[in-house]
Amino acid sequence: MERPQPDSMPQDLSEALKEATKEVHTQAENAEFMRNFQKGQVTREGFKLVMASLYHIYVALEEEIEHNKESPVFAPVYFPEELHRKAALEQDLAFWYGPRWQEVIPYTPAMQRYVKRLHEVGRTEPELLVAHAYTRYLGDLSGGQVLKKIAQKALGLPSSGEGLAFFTFPNIASATKFKQLYRSRMNSLEMTPAVRQRVIEEAKTAFLLNIQLFEELQELLTHDTKDQSPSRAPGLRQRASNKAQDSAPVETPRGKTPLNTHSQAPLLRWVLTLSFLVATVAVGLYAM
């Protein structure tokens, strides 16, 4: 009897997800902004924007995880004590923005689209939620320590870890062993071939949503770097404002009004912020 060829053998879901996201991972990995970050070119203002972006993502993700924690399509990979990042990000934002951080953190159109998709998945297609959880949590768990050290050195942060709680997973003794457990649980999820393919496609969507964040900022840079004079700074502010107004209405977390802080950002902030955003995704997913 003919034996099945290796390429035709069924693939674990975790391996299928990693394979399917190779192309989009390469797009992020080869970005010049990632190389900038690896050189330690990140400012405090840029880092603050990144942390605010992560907060919006994780608030939406973890809200939908809680709604679906008892569902068979997600329950096996429900690890709130080990993985959830909202509380850690709240600590970090208080450090970076002060006690009234909720009133001042930015919420860009691309971030709104990301949050909207997370809520759509959680409420209408919860079987796809695992794609977002896998992409985010294992990526951040894998690359977090590398990014933490780079940021700590570049920003002159204390060794105590203040402002970097997001990158610390105190309830995970061994990242390697936990990732093995998580993959095993994920591979045990029962799903039809059709659902499995949708999960794989959703993982690509998750990655592309991250890349869209970079593209949004890059678009602002492309227009405004044509004229470097200080008098052109309002142009960046006006485009950022128009972009937010022209975007389709989306649901904001906990009724929060989107805040547009582009008007207060110097041009250099966007370059350095992009470098860190790309590194956050690319380094993390590369190590998954």
Curated annotation (Swiss-Prot):
Residues at the site labelled Important for catalytic activity: 140
Membrane-traversing stretches? 266-288
Q: What is its EC number?
A: 1.14.14.18
Membrane topology category: Single-pass type IV membrane protein
Q: Which residues carry this modification: Phosphoserine?
A: 229
Instruction: Identify which top EC class this enzyme belongs to.
Output: oxidoreductase
Give binding positions for heme b: 18, 25, 134, 183
Q: How is it modified after translation?
A: A soluble form arises by proteolytic removal of the membrane anchor.
Reaction equations catalysed = heme b + 3 reduced [NADPH--hemoprotein reductase] + 3 O2 = biliverdin IXalpha + CO + Fe(2+) + 3 oxidized [NADPH--hemoprotein reductase] + 3 H2O + H(+)
| Keyword Phosphoprotein listed | yes
Q: Could you give the domain comment from the record?
A: The transmembrane domain is necessary for its oligomerization.
The protein here is known as Heme oxygenase 1
The scientific name of the source species is Pongo abelii (Sumatran orangutan)
Q: Which gene encodes it?
A: HMOX1
